[in-house]
Amino acid sequence: MVNFSNKLTKDQIPGWEEYYFNYKMLKGRVNEYTEQTKEGTQYRRRVLKDFSKLLDDEIEKIVLFMIEQQGLIAARLEDLGKRRARLQDIPLLQEITELREDYRSVGLDLVTLLKFVELNANAVRKILKKFDERLGYKFTDYYVRSRSNHPYSQLQQVFRHVGIGAVVGALSRNLSDLEERQGSYLNIYDQHPLAIPKDPIIDLITATADKLTNSTNFLRFLGQHALIAQADSTAGTEDEQHVGEDEYHLMSLVLNLANTFLYMVNTYIVVPTADGYATSLGAAATACGAVIGSMAVAQVFSSVYFSAWSNRSYFRPLLFSSVVLLLGNVMYAMAFDLGSLTILLLGRVLCGMGSARAVNRRYISDCVPPRIRMQASAAFVSASALGMACGPALAGLLQTNFSLYGLTINQITLPGWIMAFGWLVYLIWLWILFQEPDLGPDVKDFYEGSSSSTSTRYMEQEKMEQGFTEHLLPSEQDEEDDNGDEEHNETLSSSTTTLRPASSVASAYTLLTPSVKVQLLIYFMLKYAMEILLAESSVVTGYYFGWDIGTVSVFLAVLGLSVLPVNAIVGTYISNMFEDRQILVASEMALLAGVMLSFKLTVEYTAAQYVCSAVLTFVSAEVVEGVNLSLLSRVMSARLSRGTYNGGLLSTEAGTVARVVADGTITAAGLLAGEGRLLNATLLPALLVCVASIAATLSTYNSLFY
């Protein structure tokens, strides 16, 4: 493994050596501080002051040189602009070609500058981590808090590359103007950004800048929801891409996305009618929590065995999932004529046992080529969101009542029959068109924990992921590089062990940093609040406002349809204006406000108050989920990006447990407090969990800096 000091020296740009971060000197100073503190000859406050000054001086050196280089690039652009102006009246093809190449040369120099900043940013991050490890201080937390939020922050100059966007804009506009217009008189500012033809050098600059700052867009923002390992757009060889294309089967991917969509429809199609079904079988309306939540209870266990099963096959778990869901929905529909609440609950449990979302996620991660993996991840999230919206909407359309061969077909049983038919069609489609990918013995050994496998494929994936997982604070890759500072003769087998996925719940738990634990708590909180809102909506609106099934269905469908627009706004605009941690805290506060506004504190409780508070709660929860998973996908250990106990499974389990607890809360509150006090009784725990998650977020706020 390469020593980072040597790597830093090797990758330096000739002529710029004196402007790089002096990692070797600072590392030596850390070693001195370590010895002095052991001997008692150095005080903590003095160490912090001295090291802070050294860091400030090094970062200032980098920033001033970066600004100087930006000025030189701007001056070159100004000169090129004058040359372009002279060609306006008498355009000469040879001159235009030369001018275009000169603009591209400026673009390459900008890429070089960005790589200079990236290498220095890595050095800053690593020396901060090394200081904390050696001396046991929380210096990183102090330094980030005091420097990153200061109005004259030079640290932000390094990590946010202020001013680069203006240079990219100038390059894009001038290169676009120099292209053959073929009769078009549109300026780039008159076109949508996605419609502007981009020169390859602009794509290279954008990819390099994105790698440095983790800048996001809607597609990447959606894709990160799935917690699926993505490839670095600037990494990977042509051979790697070619192998991925050979293994890729479009229809199999579509079948996985269809499974995700149908399962989410299956989950939420019963929400508007669950209370009516419970009362028709002699139970209380609040037993809807048990009806809805029984599916989530089973999903807690099914997610684990499906994730493990997908180590060996994708077709068989999908086949099993379809059969189980078909039988579960038939049982759900027949419970009405059998007059059995037990059959109803068993049917929902059986549906939960068919949750194959872990398989769907793993298929995208392992069998979709890096070139389109982000699009596939975004499609996975979109399929879930659309299923969530279509479920209640479909329930609102099933307003009928007749008998067929002795079976009652009405608005209560039709969701079960419709979903059973849907899973039957899907089962046939799956049997005919799904193509089982060849995982190969190495991949199976890697996931199953065999020490004989070198797992080359996944070591290459690890290299590709490094571009999106480099942050200011400690990461799994930091640990590997720091080990390289101390040991230069690590074997291939030890490297493979470092990359090996977690083999048990206990080993997965040891990989969770405090920040990751807090983010899983946040995920629990938002799913708890959303489930309380959705699951009790039919009972609350029926009790206070007299809403029928159709009205509740429309209300829930509108909430579900808000998911994609909200993510589009956050992913395209807001996340590029603010840091993720800032958006996270603000949206958590908004969620808390939504929960507080939902309480019935006066004699009269209006539909306007309920709808406004519900929309605020739901939309805020969606923003929290998107930003939280975006952060989680970057700070979680690389070893949790694959294997049975992966990051996606952990987040799914956290969310599923939250739904189980929320549905149990609704049922218990209904039995103990009755429908009249159900709303406040269920909102109080949601309020407490929300406050706890905000406090936990603030306690780890500085560790979310990148």
UniProtKB/Swiss-Prot annotation:
This protein's UniProt keywords: Membrane, Transmembrane, Transmembrane helix
Disulfide bonds: none
UniProt xrefs under Gene3D superfamilies: MFS general substrate transporter like domains
Chain intervals with Acidic residues compositional bias: 476-488
An example Gene Ontology CC term for this record: membrane
Keyword Ribosomal protein set for record: no
Keyword Cell cycle assigned: no
Domain SPX: 2-145
Localization per record: Membrane
Chain positions covered by the region annotation Disordered: 475-498
Transmembrane segments: 251-271, 281-301, 318-338, 340-359, 378-398, 414-434, 520-540, 554-574, 583-603, 611-631, 678-698
Pfam families, alphabetized: MFS_1 (PF07690)
Family membership noted in the UniProt record: Belongs to the major facilitator superfamily.
Record protein name field: SPX domain-containing membrane protein Os09g0521800
Species of origin: Oryza sativa subsp. japonica
Lineage, broadest ranks: Eukaryota, Viridiplantae, Streptophyta, Embryophyta, Tracheophyta
